[in-house]
């Protein structure tokens, strides 16, 4: 009986351990939440003048250049970072949330496009790198440019009314704005791609690999041409060089086939 009672008492202690741990967790959460709420209350009570100053700055903000929006948003976010919990504190004030969010959206959207365009424009093909990975990298960069313009188009459709209302510049969002720079970057990328394919064609010795390279080059050139709406003079020259190499490779392939056919006919006649 003693053994059983020990087991029962032991089981009772083990069962109570998780309950004690859970209680400690709950106490800790209550204390943390209370401290956070107290910090929010303190900010609401002590930062009122500062927040009302920011409200006036946001409400009166009007821009003609998207770069100025970027600078303003950076400044605003730096100022708001001093609050313990931005959303929780600002909801106690008449904060112009829609305008602040619209400015952030415009600034971040523009910076994202600028980053993509810069990445593509600054790309340098390293001839020491194998051809396959180099071409894949250029394809990946082009897809980023495509997505950037697509996202810009969607953003423009949803944002036009809000941006006009909040005096946020939109000229950078037009087809003649930053999208034109992205398309130019894609054209330059196509030129580098085709030059790499042309250089590689001189090194491969015909066969399926040569044909695959030509197809890759032409397909990429076509995609970029459709996306950008045309090529500049330098890129058109690179395309013509690729086209000439493709014709030359095709003629060589035909000559080899004819030569093989003649050799086969002679051996059969013998």
Q: What are these regions, as identified by a protein language model?
A:
Residues 5-6, 10-270:
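Extended alpha-helical scaffold/assembly modules in large eukaryotic proteins
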């Amino acid at each position: 009986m003693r053994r059983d009672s020990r087991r029962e008492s032991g089981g009772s202690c083990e069962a109570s351990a998780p309950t004690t741990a859970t209680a400690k967790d709950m106490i800790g959460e209550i204390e943390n939440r209370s401290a956070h709420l107290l910090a929010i209350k303190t900010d609401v009570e002590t930062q009122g003048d500062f927040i009302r100053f920011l409200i006036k700055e946001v409400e009166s903000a009007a821009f003609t250049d998207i770069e100025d929006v970027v600078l303003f948003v950076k400044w605003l976010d730096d100022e708001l970072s001093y609050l313990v919990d931005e959303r929780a504190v600002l909801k106690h004030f008449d904060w112009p949330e829609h305008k602040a969010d619209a400015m952030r959206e415009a600034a971040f959207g523009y910076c994202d496009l600028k980053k993509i365009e810069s990445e593509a424009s600054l790309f340098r093909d390293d001839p020491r790198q194998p051809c396959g990975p180099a071409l894949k990298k250029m394809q990946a960069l082009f897809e980023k440019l495509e997505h950037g313009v697509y996202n810009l188009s969607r953003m423009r459709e949803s944002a036009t009314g809000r941006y006009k209302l909040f005096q946020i510049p939109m000229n950078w969002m037009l087809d003649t704005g930053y999208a034109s720079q992205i398309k130019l970057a894609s054209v330059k990328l196509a030129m580098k791609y085709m030059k790499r394919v042309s250089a590689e064609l001189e090194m491969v010795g015909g066969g399926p690999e040569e044909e695959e390279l030509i197809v890759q080059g032409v397909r990429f050139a076509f995609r970029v041409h459709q996306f950008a709406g045309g090529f500049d003079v330098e890129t058109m020259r690179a395309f013509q060089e690729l086209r000439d190499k493709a014709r030359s490779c095709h003629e060589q392939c035909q000559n080899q086939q004819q030569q093989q056919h003649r050799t086969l006919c002679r051996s059969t006649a013998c």
